[in-house]
Amino acid sequence: MAEVHNQLEIKFRLTDGSDIGPKAFPDATTVSALKETVISEWPREKENGPKTVKEVKLISAGKVLENSKTVKDYRSPVSNLAGAVTTMHVIIQAPVTEKEKKPKGDPKMNKCVCSVM
C-alpha cells in the first residue's frame, strides 16, 4: 500500500484534446523524464510531434514545469485521493532557428518618435 503514495497517475492532454495515458510514475521521476515519455508515446498519426525535450512544455495547475524538478515537487493534496489522476497539459514549441533569431530589417527603421508641440 505504501507504493501507491510514492507514485502519481498522470495523463498528458494534447492541444487537440486527446490524451496520452494515464500512466503511473514514481515520485522521483524528473519532469525531463516525463517529457521523454511524451515524445516516445506521441501518437504516430499526429503531425508535428516533438523531437527533443526542449520542444515540450508541461503545464500542471497553471505552472510550467521545470526539467530538473521531480513529480514529488509538483504533487498536490488532491493527487493523494484514491483513483486520482493528474492531468498535465502538453505544449509543443518548434525550435527557433538561427534565421528566426536575427532581427528583420534595419533596426533604425523600427523606431517610433513622438513630439508634442
UniProtKB/Swiss-Prot annotation:
Main location: membrane
Other comments on record: Heat stable and remains soluble at temperatures exceeding 90 degrees Celsius.
Lipid moiety-binding region (S-farnesyl cysteine): C114
Topology relative to the membrane: Lipid-anchor
Organism the protein comes from: Arabidopsis thaliana (Mouse-ear cress)
Residues that span the membrane, as ranges: none
Annotated Gene3D superfamilies: Phosphatidylinositol 3-kinase Catalytic Subunit, Chain A, domain 1
Pro-piece positions: 115-117
The Ubiquitin-like domain, residue ranges: 8-74
Lipid attachment residues per UniProt (S-palmitoyl cysteine): C112
Keyword Lipoprotein: yes
Keywords: Cell membrane, Lipoprotein, Membrane, Methylation, Palmitate, Prenylation
Gene Ontology terms: cellular component: plasma membrane
Designated name of the protein: Membrane-anchored ubiquitin-fold protein 1
